[in-house]
Amino acid sequence: MLTIDINCDCGESYGAFQVGDDDGILPFVSSANVACGGHAGDPMVMRRTVRRCRDLGVAVGAHPSYPDLYGFGRRVLPLTPDEIEAWVLTQIGSLAAIARSEKVELRHVKPHGALYNVAARDLTVAMAIARAVAAFSRELALVGLAGSLLITAGHEVGVPVLAEAFADRTYEADGTLRNRHHPDALIIDPAACLAQTLHIIRDGAVRAVDGTLVPLQAATICIHGDTPGAALRAATIRQGLAAAGITVQAPQR
């Protein structure tokens, strides 16, 4: 029987600013990447999100970023490896404290935005993130783009790794994500998201924007929750996977 983890980024509101449709998307995923103060996610948002995940049986992970509230973590900041390690460790610890108070154990760490993208191609940054994860707990899984240097770094420091693919993002021929500046970077149509998800799970490949068939082995697939129609896409994917006999569940330790 085929199984797959479906994850989403969530808890990305901050104070009076509301981002994403967490209530709409969380019932359809098995893992959640919770913002923990770097780009979003104040303490009350973190607590509310952890509680919602606990009630739904969704595995909770940290979603650290560059310290960039103003830019929502989508800007590259000129930090040293030591600074990156410290910022990532601090954000993991913040969410872990709240999770512990709610009797929830963190399961994974997935960098956000620019930090995720830089770590995919820069081993120095990737190693800084991996060291932070290992310093906190070697039982935490490190989530990174399938085939990227972040996966390499996780193996190097000896933490579990989860190679990630995307249901709602398009790919370049080299296996990287198409830059969000391009109008076709996001896949909006729910049926197209489901088709890409099934292609990844069944065939271990994804079709790039230029038509190239890119080999891709993924343990977890992300659905973004901060775009219009996210809940419908998540529901379509979950229902389509069930119809195909594919079980959705968080990775087992």
Curated annotation (Swiss-Prot):
InterPro entries in the record: Glyco_hydro/deAcase_b/a-brl, LamB/YcsF/PxpA-like
SUPFAM superfamilies: Glycoside hydrolase/deacetylase (SSF88713)
Keywords: ATP-binding, Hydrolase, Nucleotide-binding
CDD domains xref list: LamB_YcsF_like
Pfam families on file: LamB_YcsF
GO MF: 5-oxoprolinase (ATP-hydrolyzing) activity; ATP binding
Catalytic activity: 5-oxo-L-proline + ATP + 2 H2O = L-glutamate + ADP + phosphate + H(+)
EC number assigned by the record: 3.5.2.9
GO BP terms in the entry: carbohydrate metabolic process
Keyword hit for Coiled coil: no
Enzyme class: hydrolase
Gene3D superfamilies tied to this protein: Glycoside hydrolase/deacetylase (3.20.20.370)
Family (UniProt): Belongs to the LamB/PxpA family.
Quaternary structure and partners: Forms a complex composed of PxpA, PxpB and PxpC.
Role according to the record: Catalyzes the cleavage of 5-oxoproline to form L-glutamate coupled to the hydrolysis of ATP to ADP and inorganic phosphate.
Protein name listed in UniProt: 5-oxoprolinase subunit A
Gene: pxpA
